[in-house]
Amino acid sequence: MSDETLAVALDTIDSLVPEMEWKTRAMARGLMRGYDARWSDQAERMIVCEEEFVVPIWNLANKGIKPSQSRTLKFAGKRDKRVLRNSSRWILDHKTTSVDIQDPDATYWRQLAINAQASWYLLAGHYEDLGAEGIIWDVIRKPAIKPKKIAQTMQKSVVAGNPYCGFDVSDNAQAYIVENGTENAELFELRVTRETINDPDRYYQRKPIMRLLHDMVDDCQELWQLAQDVLYSRRCNWQPCNSNACLTYGSPCQYLGICSGHDTIDSDNWRRREQVHSELDSIEGDGKNIITTSRLACFQNCRRKHHYRYDLGLERHGREPSAALQFGTTFHAALDVWWKAYKL
């Protein structure tokens, strides 16, 4: 990895995060520097980046001579990367999290071991004859640190021209310390970088997951059955509300006002999306007959929410994505730039 490529990845972060959100920008930049230090000598080489696919949904339990496929729905998604690892082909997917990933038996890894996205993306790859051995989870953990006040002795040391967290400091940062005695964006970024470089296994992990043929058969039938449930719910106009899903970590579902009778779908608070899968660029039409992992997760979480989001395409005007989603999207974009240096 050249310094120039890392610089482009950092510039990508700067272009996506406003300067006023300097804490988020510094966190992402420091985490990107640590990622570069951790994986710059990686063996993986990228075959393709951000690859969209659309495949049939098959029913292998069909009593006929041949398996049948859905005449209405198709399964679609976007692979982060396809890579070559030790002469074998793999699908690689990036994840950002704030929980423990260092312990191989951590809850996070147990959940990913049965993650539907991995199963169905590998299944789609099998339909496309990609020859993927499995999926590699490329997981990045955000450090649980914040900008802090700098001790007097450290202030004097840095102002005198000594490094901060092992890195040289600009004149502007020195002046900021003299005036404020706390970390600014530059200093916080350096501390995040040092934290991740000193403990790479805590913040960066890659784990390959393989699926056997009989597992993929089960995955195929699960996808088929869920797709049939989606169609049944649509045809019968049956979308029960899961009241246990109205609040997630204290944040209300965006459709709670409609479900509780305080709003209507025809009010000025809502607009109807022309295409219900904004993350996919290659989908033609409104996408309402396209099944994705995100859509099925929504359907399993609350069928009423699924109806509003995917059957009707309802979206609240001016709704901002969560901070976690914004951070993940920003870091993902920087990773795409970084990985270009490893393209075959």
Regions found by a protein language model. Give the residues of each.
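RecB-family 4Fe-4S metal-dependent nuclease core
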Residues: 1-344
